Every structure is written in structure tokens, then in C-alpha cells.
């Protein structure tokens, strides 16, 4: 009797869909409700809503590169999302330490791709600051990407079960 195959972690793509939905809903709210480049205090001395735009990547990297970066970052995000989705298909459903961060990165990357294709830039609106020190504005998609990247690094560093093949959930 053959063993039943272990279901893949592709079900975790539902989390990616949730991230994309929350990200796009929040950006639609921002575009319809917040003034451009005007702080709206949420927690005085720490957190503002601040509608701004980013044509580059994290911390506005390459934002003044002349336009080619839109297609570069779109292709990069789609490529990485495709690779992570492939790895999800090769990961056992119960391997949440791999599946959760992959799904977060996919959702965040696709959320920002939608912005780039619809608007030519990414809509950012969360601004944290202390005194005159301001963290660059970001959005829900950015948060998911960072959370996923941290998860990949932390779970990869502290995995005590042995070495895993990337995206498989299988031990080497």
C-alpha cells in the first residue's frame, strides 16, 4: 500500500491573498481620505498617517533612476514571488516556519506590484518618528515583506531539526 502524499503548503497562499487584500484596501482608503504630504497624527510623538509615494524600493532606493526601476522592481517581485510559490508547492503543509514567511513575502511583493502597475509608484502612508528622527514611510505590504524576511532568517538560523532543502520542508 502506497503512502498518501503529504499535502503541499500552497494553502498558505490564502494568507498572501489576505495580505494583498488588506494592503490594497488600506491604500484605497489612503488615496480617498488622506491629504498628500501632510502628517495626520495617530499617536502624538510617534505615529502619523502620511500619504507619500515611492518610485523606488525600500528607503526609496533608486527612486530617482529615471523610470526603468518600475519594471525592474516589478519583474524582481514577480520572480521572487514565483520562486517562493514554487518552494511552497514543495513544502509540507505543516512546515509553517517555512510557509508563513514565504506567504508573507509573496503577499507583500504582489501588493506593491499592483501599486507599481496601477499608479507607477507605491503608496506609503505609515510614518513612525521620535523627535526629529523619522523612519521612512511604509505600508502593509512592506510590513509583510519585512516580517516574512525576518521569519525566513530567524527560522533558518534557529532550525534545530537539521538542514532543510530550500522550499521543501524536507531534510537533506
Swiss-Prot record:
Pfam families: Peptidase_A8
Protein name from the UniProt record: Lipoprotein signal peptidase
Cross-referenced InterPro entries: Peptidase_A8 (IPR001872)
Transmembrane spans: 10-30, 68-88, 98-118, 138-158
Active site: 124, 142
This protein's pathway: Protein modification; lipoprotein biosynthesis (signal peptide cleavage)
Transmembrane helix listed as a keyword: yes
Record field: catalytic activity: Release of signal peptides from bacterial membrane prolipoproteins. Hydrolyzes -Xaa-Yaa-Zaa-|-(S,diacylglyceryl)Cys-, in which Xaa is hydrophobic (preferably Leu), and Yaa (Ala or Ser) and Zaa (Gly or Ala) have small, neutral side chains
Subcellular localization, as worded in the UniProt entry: Cell inner membrane
Gene Ontology CC annotations of this record: plasma membrane
Keyword flag Transmembrane: yes
Swiss-Prot/TrEMBL keywords: Aspartyl protease, Cell inner membrane, Cell membrane, Hydrolase, Membrane, Protease, Transmembrane, Transmembrane helix
Any one GO BP annotation for this protein: proteolysis
Enzymatic class: hydrolase
Top-level lineage group: Bacteria
Chain's role: This protein specifically catalyzes the removal of signal peptides from prolipoproteins.
GO MF terms held by the record: aspartic-type endopeptidase activity
Family: Belongs to the peptidase A8 family.
EC number(s) reported in the record: 3.4.23.36
Membrane topology category: Multi-pass membrane protein
Amino acid at each position: 500500500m502506497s503512502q498518501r502524499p503529504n499535502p503541499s503548503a500552497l494553502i498558505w497562499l490564502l494568507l498572501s491573498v489576505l495580505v494583498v487584500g488588506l494592503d490594497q484596501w488600506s491604500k484605497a482608503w489612503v488615496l480617498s481620505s488622506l491629504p498628500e504630504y501632510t502628517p495626520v497624527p495617530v499617536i502624538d510623538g510617534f505615529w502619523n498617517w502620511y500619504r507619500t509615494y515611492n518610485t523606488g524600493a525600500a528607503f526609496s532606493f533608486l527612486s530617482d533612476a529615471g523610470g526603468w526601476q518600475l519594471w525592474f522592481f516589478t519583474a524582481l517581485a514577480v520572480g521572487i514571488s514565483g520562486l517562493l510559490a514554487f518552494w511552497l508547492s514543495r513544502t509540507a503543509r505543516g512546515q509553517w516556519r517555512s510557509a508563513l514567511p514565504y506567504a508573507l513575502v509573496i503577499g507583500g511583493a504582489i501588493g506593491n506590484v499592483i501599486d507599481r502597475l496601477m499608479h507607477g509608484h507605491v503608496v506609503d502612508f505609515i510614518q513612525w518618528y521620535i523627535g526629529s528622527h523619522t523612519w521612512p514611510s511604509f505600508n502593509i505590504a512592506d510590513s509583510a515583506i519585512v516580517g516574512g524576511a525576518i521569519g525566513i532568517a530567524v527560522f533558518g538560523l534557529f532550525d534545530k531539526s537539521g538542514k532543510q532543502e530550500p522550499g521543501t520542508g524536507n531534510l537533506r
